[in-house]
Regions:
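A membrane-topology feature that recognizes alpha-helical transmembrane segments
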Residues: 1-197
Length: 197
């Protein structure tokens, strides 16, 4: 089975699990959901093949879990403005495994702690808890790829910049610089993460 096929299968299984366990899930099988699934699977499989094709298969699995996590979270955030807590633990565990498999300097560990404190005490007030947890999980993968605190903050800035540009083009920003209508933030977090892995 190809990486794309495996990611599509795992993503569908996770969505099926969410539908079965949450009676008020609100997820719809529509054109937009299909586009999110295909885009997420192509982006995940493409990234794994291009950036990690020659590495150990365990590295592929770690990034596959991240790709499934982000694809499902983008779909649920887009359709229901919900990020399921049950998805956080597997993605965080595999991100931690990545940090343990690669030589992460002490500055990387300090960056994770500092970033976590910034998220919990400052930034989560600007956006939802699910978005904050996604930034936290992304930070594990960024540090595992050799990133620093500056990289983590740059990822946040890029996500906000991408959100701002797209919403400006859509005419969803008022004169004070705020969003007229709230929009899901997780798609912008996921897209900007590809630049920093």
């Amino acid at each position: 089975m190809t990486m794309f096929g495996l990611q599509l299968l795992l993503t569908a299984a996770v969505i099926n699990m969410l539908v079965r366990t949450d009676e008020e899930h609100g997820l719809r099988a529509d054109w937009e959901a299909g586009c999110i699934l295909l885009t997420g699977c192509f982006a995940g499989a493409g990234y794994i093949a291009c950036a990690h094709g020659r590495e150990h298969p365990m590295i592929w699995m770690i990034y596959l879990i991240l790709a499934v996590y982000l694809t499902v979270c983008v779909l649920t955030d887009r359709q229901t403005c919900k990020v399921y807590d049950c998805l956080q633990l597997p993605a965080a565990l595999f991100g931690t495994a990545l940090c343990m498999m690669r030589p992460v300097p002490a500055q990387g560990g300090a960056a994770l702690v500092c970033f976590a404190l910034l998220q919990y005490f400052l930034f989560m007030r600007l956006y939802g808890r699910g978005d904050g947890m996604t930034f936290q999980i992304s930070s594990l993968y960024i540090i595992g790829a050799g990133g620093s605190l500056e990289t983590l903050l740059s990822h946040m800035a890029a996500a906000f910049a991408l959100l701002g540009v797209v919403q400006l083009v859509r005419g969803n920003i008022n004169r004070k610089g705020n969003l007229k209508l709230p929009v899901p933030f997780l798609p912008y977090i996921a897209c900007s993460l590809l630049w920093f892995l």
